[in-house]
Amino acid sequence: MAALILRTLLDNNVFSSSDYIHTIKDPLSTSMVEVSGNPQSCGVSEAFSSPSLKKADVSLTFGSSQEISYAAMSAPLNADTSRIPDEIAPTDVNKTELDLSTNNFGVPLADVVLPSSSSTTLSPSIVSEQQQQQQQQQQQQQQAISSEEIITSKGGIKSGAGELPFSIVYGSAFSKTPEIVSFQQPTQKQINDFLQMKSDATRVVTSDGYIFREIFNPDHDDGFKQALEMYGSSFFEPTEPGKNHLHTLCNRGLYRMMVMEDDKGLVLACAFIVEVHAYKSYHMDYLAVRPGIRGGGLGGKFFKQLTTHLRNEQKYLIITFESEPKLVPWYLRMSCLHLNVVSDQVTYENGETFFWWLLVVPLGKIIDDGSDADTDSDSEHPTSAPSTTAPNYALPLSLTEKQRNRSYILYNESGVSYEFNQQTINEIAQYLLTFMSDAKK
């Protein structure tokens, strides 16, 4: 009967689309109820379907905390069930959803309010006291189900005595990174196992046998501990955050963390990335290579794999980062664009001034003067970058007026385009100075 009511809701456009499929386990049988629809329109907290029930009790949650229970008598399939009470008109979604795509749950787990035995409200005028007691027992049994075994592979879930308290979905057609939808508060072990699965999903073995992956669980990933030590050997206080401070910033969700390892799990290079939503870009705040192997080309291989990983997300179109003057020629060889934008500068007591530059890597193709030139980091000779000849970086880079005012139209395979020039990158630089200064406090 629950399936009948839910189908009726679909027929009346309570769910506006069918791109979302949700499966709920019947606590009285092995049958499953599939709820199709748009999660932005309606959230279903419980639905029961069993031959032993005379009624189908469906609890619908709308708005912030309003919960409405709707019980309908069994009816033939051809019965007129198109009339739904006006008070069940959906207004907003209120389902507990933990988005782990960036290691930022959105809300602290301790603050998540999850369904309990008291969350299903039944009308006394319709449902007998015996049915209320029976339903409470069913919910208690369902919550007592043990699920010690967790996800065992990228594509499936293995449970112990029953269903897991959450299901795995994939967020978009472009992303293979899984997300988690929770109906009960998961244990810390389940969260750790899931985040490890997410990291494994990003794992890529390069042609040289190195392993590139993204870290989602800083406190329980040995790769992060190694990356933190590598950061400490490359960036120093007081101009940069200390290791403990950086660790705190990662736990806050400020950074995405990428590493490259050998086959024994030794981290050889790492990067800390910030997503700049306002400008459709990523900002690479820190990149480090393990001391002792610098200068051997490993940094370039890591940078290439990093930009490939970000480009495949088809989420943002450019990656920006600051660079010390002496490193600018290396970044230009990596197909970076130098648009003469100073991201920061410092003047020492002796009067000497050093500049930091905001360089750009297009994560897509550039349309320039009617041409379609790919500007990936694997391009041997970038068509849009200035000469790699090292100029005098004690002063701003001298470019022609055409280069200074040059605009770039960038697009990726998803069809999204973005136009930027020196002025746009200068706006990003000013934004980052303010944003990162506040975020690192």
UniProtKB/Swiss-Prot annotation:
Amino acid composition bias (Polar residues), ranges on this chain: 382-391
Pfam families: Acetyltransf_1
Low complexity bias spans: 121-143
InterPro entries registered for this protein in UniProt: Acyl_CoA_acyltransferase (IPR016181), GNAT_dom (IPR000182)
Residue span of region Disordered: 121-146, 371-392
Superkingdom of the source species: Eukaryota
Gene3D superfamilies in the cross-refs: 3.40.630.30
Protein name: Uncharacterized protein DDB_G0283377
UniProt GO molecular function: acyltransferase activity, transferring groups other than amino-acyl groups
